[in-house]
């Protein structure tokens, strides 16, 4: 999604973000493909791999690619790898059979881009560090970048363009940052992604981060990559808040949780309803923690 720089600046100022100049890359062509190519990266033990994938598809539906063993890092390693395509989001699952080279495992998501070199230039111009320089993988090229606030993301490009079906609902990438880095991260990521702020609530209900007596700042962003929810906190988070990297939107929360429980998924926070959303946090076999939500207005 292309956004004229002046419009972006207006929205940022309206959202209370400081007017610090961003590099000129904001005017460069966007490199996003589509939200279904935003894949959450999940690392599980090889022994839990099959059970985890089965629990995902039992909970959300969808399909999987064939499980294979690959080297997906620039240095020697070996991992089980499988792509899970659900109606509510895509996931890349890794089960390393060797020690995991640093910093792999810290990247929350992979964004497919139209041109990896152009994406790297745009990311750098907008303040991201390239913490893993571009390298070839079995089906294309990858890199890992880090935004202000310590937010790590993979950028990837495929030699043969993939073709995933459109999502039923677009998941949210849930990013926890400090007040010191919230404005910087938000401004720079929006410039890179050609995104927009769709809401900025400085007094969002604290129940969303496990603190029902408090409020916090919540910023919601949309771009061609998908959705990002920025949760601005002081870091005083009760477990499991902060561990969930993705929020999945479903049509019926109770029905989804019934399927999840039958597949061995644990509901680890009490479901709540606030601001038109019903939500909870769950833990899948293998340890993966995720938020699941539905519109409270759906019947």
Q: Model-found features: residue ranges?
A:
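Bacterial N-terminal signal peptides
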Residues: 7-19
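Catalytic cores of nucleotide-enabled group-transfer and carboxylate-activating enzymes in metabolic
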Residues: 91-96, 128-131
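Short beta->alpha transition motifs characteristic of CBS
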Residues: 156-161, 292-299
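Short, structured interface segments
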Residues: 143-164
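Sec/Tat signal peptide C-region and signal peptidase I cleavage site
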Residues: 19-25
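Core segments of cupin and vicinal oxygen chelate
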Residues: 31-34, 41-88, 125, 133-148, ...
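Positively charged n-region of N-terminal signal peptides that target proteins for export
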Residues: 1-6
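Vicinal oxygen chelate
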Residues: 35-47, 82-84, 96-122, 141-146, ...
């Amino acid at each position: 999604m292309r956004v004229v720089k002046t419009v972006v600046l207006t929205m940022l100022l309206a959202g209370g973000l400081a007017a610090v100049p961003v590099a000129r890359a904001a005017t460069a062509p966007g490199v996003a493909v589509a939200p279904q190519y935003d894949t959450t990266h999940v690392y599980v033990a090889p022994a839990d791999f099959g059970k985890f994938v089965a629990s995902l598809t039992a909970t959300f539906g969808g399909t999987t690619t064939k499980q294979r063993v690959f080297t997906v890092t620039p240095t020697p390693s070996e991992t089980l790898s499988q792509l899970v395509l659900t109606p509510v989001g895509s996931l890349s699952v890794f089960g390393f059979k060797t020690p995991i080279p640093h910093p792999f495992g810290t990247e929350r998501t992979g964004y497919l881009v139209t041109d990896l070199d152009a994406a790297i230039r745009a990311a750098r111009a907008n303040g991201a560090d390239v913490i893993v320089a571009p390298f070839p993988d079995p089906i294309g090229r990858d890199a890992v970048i880090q935004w202000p606030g310590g937010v790590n993301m993979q950028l990837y490009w495929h030699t043969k363009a993939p073709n995933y079906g459109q999502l039923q609902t677009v998941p949210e990438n849930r990013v926890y940052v400090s007040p010191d880095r919230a404005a910087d991260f938000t401004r720079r990521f929006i410039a890179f992604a050609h995104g927009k702020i769709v809401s900025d609530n400085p007094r969002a209900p604290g129940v969303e981060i496990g603190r029902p007596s408090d409020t916090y700042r919540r910023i919601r962003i949309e771009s061609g990559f998908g959705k990002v929810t920025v949760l601005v906190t002081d870091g005083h988070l009760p477990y499991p808040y902060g561990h969930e990297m993705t929020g999945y939107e479903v049509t019926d929360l109770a029905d989804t949780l019934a399927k999840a429980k039958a597949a061995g998924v644990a509901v680890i926070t009490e479901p709540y309803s606030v601001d038109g959303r019903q939500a909870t946090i769950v833990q899948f076999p293998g340890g993966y923690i995720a938020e699941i939500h539905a519109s409270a207005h759906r019947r």
